[in-house]
């Protein structure tokens, strides 16, 4: 059987498959379905400094080959995540976990990351810079290289854990933003977050989602994700996590050939809660089919 293990920012993973933040809760919810230790790791629900109740409903719209969501980072806040959610996770997951962090100011990001830095089970901090900067006219941190670099530098000051910056695809030049984060000290880049989308209810003549627009994800965005992973991984020297529309073992291989060291799976978990487990179990078959001995040998193999 081919070797599935990869090294992500100095931490060994049994395999490269990672459920994406926002599609896997805090992990323990899925532990009733299967042994989540089969996963490489997972990125838990986006966590902010203060509790957030999220956006008004409806928050979800179905699309051909995907979905739009505008959940609005609903979470109990970092204090409660540490006090209540992580202890439940420790009972069923015995590997380092990825903490996904969001914020609305540079100080927010630094505060939340500093709190999570003290948690032994947290292996990586995945910093979502797709949030609006309340001090920057509401523009997303991830759309401006300078703002993304500022968040990166602030987080690096308060943690010794690997910092992975999660980038938005809703930009003109994602490579410039990735390079700015790398220069500011990022240990890795994850991409892509959701694309901005909208659906309209023809009867009501109004947007389906109360927030009007939301994040479009699912198989339809996969080719865009592969292209951006390829571009970024060839421009930076730090590891890249690929995501966006991944739904089968072949997609994982394709992402890795494009340059990803590890691969996150998002919307597929909402369609099939066993998606990540099934993908991991199917990887040996796909590796055999394409004569791949180890996954490490294919990372960035497409020039």
Where are these regions (language model features)?
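Short gly/pro/ser/thr-enriched loop/turn and capping motifs at secondary-structure boundaries
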Residues: 48-53, 132-134, 196-199, 270-272
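N-terminal capping/small domains of soluble enzymes
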Residues: 1-97, 102-104, 279
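A short, charged, Gly/Pro-tolerant segment at domain boundaries
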Residues: 296-303
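Short donor-sugar binding/catalytic loops of nucleotide-sugar-dependent glycosyltransferases
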Residues: 246
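Alpha/beta enzyme core
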Residues: 104-241, 250-265
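C-terminal helical cap(s) of enzyme catalytic domains, especially alpha/beta-barrels
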Residues: 55-64, 200-214, 256, 268-293
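Short acidic/polar active-site loop segments enriched in Thr and Asp
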Residues: 39-40, 45, 95, 122-125, ...
